[in-house]
Amino acid sequence: MKTVYYYSRPNCALCEEGLLTLRLVQEDLAFDLQILNIEEDDALHEKYMLMIPVVVCDGEVIQYGNLDYPTVYEGLDDEI
């Protein structure tokens, strides 16, 4: 089973909404979800601080910012 990485940070309303969208996609596609707090890693913080939330699978950014179900589903369906 593939692992999908979700980069976010605490106290981020957009990240919370994005996680709900990602959980809906997870109901339709089987994947492991790893949630990573970018504030715990300087390199991740520098890379993603202006993009969060970010969905990544196999090293490819599927979508970032304001996540929507169709884009995330289609992007992950191609990878999984």
Positions of PLM-derived features:
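Thioredoxin-like thiol-disulfide oxidoreductase module
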Residues: 34-51
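Conserved helix-turn-beta segment immediately C-terminal to the redox Cys motif
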Residues: 21-36
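Generic recognition of short, well-ordered alpha-helical segments
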Residues: 17-20, 46-50, 67
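Non-catalytic, surface beta->alpha helical segment in thiol-disulfide oxidoreductase systems
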Residues: 60-80
